[in-house]
Amino acid sequence: MGHADGVTRRQADLTLLLATFLWGTTFAVVKGALASATPLAFLTLRFSIAALLLAPGTRFRPPPAGRELRGGLLLGALVAVGFITQTAGLVITTASRSAFIVAISSVLAPVIALALLGQRPGWLTAAALGMATLGIYLLTAPDAGGLNRGDLLTLVCAACFGAQIVAVTELGREYDARRLVWFQVAGTAIVSACALLLLERPRIHWSGAFLAALAYSVVFASTTCFLLQMSAQRHMSSARAALIFCFEPLFAALTSWLVLGERLAMLQWLGGGLIVLGMIAADLPASRAAAAGP
């Protein structure tokens, strides 16, 4: 089935899957960068450069007003808090665990859509939440090191990203996608800089490896991925988008194994698998309903 602007459902799915792959690979990259920089210093650099790169192609006139302005500020706040808590959590927890916990945002998205927009995701959501909760327990059980502060920060990140999935779906159909992306990126840069001044004693060790990680994070995770997400989600429901995001922790775990040598125990893989199954159970019925629409 095609869309008014010529984008097919399959093209939209593949576009979002590419963004999901790139975001999945970023966990290991950022984990490596945090050996050379404090979290807020890294985020401030990453998103400030990304905002500058996006600015030339962004239309700032007419200036945003009303619902677009409120939506842009909301997106900026959600992404800022999400990335700050995710990056701070990565200092403490592993990239693989972080990716599986962040992926719970896909389970939370239908719940948030129900709470805020009255969009009923179906009875499987409760079962999916139960599976995800059990998955978190197995992933962070005492034998696996227990639930640490990094995991808790990452849970906050998952809630923010779940809300962002819903907000992008609602706002992306009405307003200029690139401008909304710039709101998210610039908002994260500003909030990170303010938090840096208040909460952190910044440290950056400049090296070739750090610059490569920064460049990868800026070009792919902070600009390309957001543009791909905004472009793709104009043509799908938040539930369908959340279903595609289910692949992110798998990409992240594979990259963390290849790049960082991280390995999960069998019980942790079982926990991660339950989280992914929970996401699929929560999102697939609504995604099928959207695909069978008029």
Predicted features along the sequence, with ranges:
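Helix-helix packing/entry segments at the starts of transmembrane helices
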Residues: 43-45, 98-104, 167-190, 222-258
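Specific transmembrane alpha-helical segments of multi-pass solute transporters/efflux pumps
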Residues: 22, 26-27, 55-102, 109-110, ...
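Glycine-/small-residue-enriched transmembrane alpha-helix faces in small-molecule transporters
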Residues: 1-41, 77, 85, 143-170, ...
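Transmembrane alpha-helical segments that form core, pore/gating elements
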Residues: 28-29, 50-54, 109-110, 146-200, ...
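Hydrophobic/aromatic residues within transmembrane alpha-helices
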Residues: 33, 42, 46, 89, ...
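Hydrophobic transmembrane alpha-helices of multi-pass small-molecule transport proteins
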Residues: 54, 73-75, 79, 121-141, ...
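C-terminal-most transmembrane helix of multi-pass membrane proteins
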Residues: 2, 14, 46-47, 136, ...
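C-terminal transmembrane-helix exit sites in multi-pass transporters
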Residues: 53-62, 86, 105-127, 143, ...
